[in-house]
Regions:
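Short, Lys/Arg-enriched, disordered terminal segments
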Residues: 1-2, 152
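N-terminal beta1-alpha1 ligand-phosphate binding loop
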Residues: 4-25
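FMN-binding flavodoxin-like domain, especially the glycine-rich phosphate-binding loop
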Residues: 17, 25-29, 34, 48-152
Length: 152
């Protein structure tokens, strides 16, 4: 099975809640999963994973949160060619750029050669509705399936 990293930044707990939901959805499939806060990631270690799932909330008017900035800068020099990745995030529609951190991270990962295998998951605040929970589970299953080469 594949080695997967789920790295996230969460201020209010919403993004961490999504990360936990993704992790518990993938775990029964037999993958080796490591979950860490993004600010504790040595970016060189990303090369050791078969799949990478990143999560971040959006700060202010569509910016990356402070704890993601160093990570974002550090991955610019990495060659992530062949790495299968996906990005998720929490946001608030009260702000003009809903979940912009998801798009910012996807763009950087693609610029580094990574393959986005599942469209970014954007959740309003926390996954509290049945629909949001189902979207998180589907995101997780699709990522795991595409990591193994077959979309679910």
């Amino acid at each position: 099975m594949s080695k997967i990293l789920i790295a996230f930044a969460s201020m209010s707990g919403n993004t961490e809640e999504i990360a936990e939901l993704i992790k518990t959805s993938i775990e029964p499939l037999g993958h080796e999963i490591e979950m860490k806060e993004i600010e504790n990631i040595n970016t060189q270690k990303l090369l050791e994973y078969d799949g990478i799932i990143l999560g971040a909330y959006t700060w202010g008017d569509g910016e990356l949160p402070y704890e993601v900035e160093d990570f974002y800068d550090d991955i610019e020099t990495l060659d992530l060619t062949g790495k299968k990745v996906a990005v998720f995030g929490s946001g608030d529609h009260a702000y003009p750029k809903f979940c912009a951190a998801v798009d910012i991270l996807e763009e950087r990962l693609m610029a580094c050669g990574a393959e986005i295998v599942e469209q970014g998951l954007k959740v309003e605040l926390a996954p509290e509705t049945e629909e949001d929970i189902e979207r998180c589970i589907t995101f997780a299953f699709n990522f795991a399936g595409r990591l193994e080469g077959a979309a679910l």
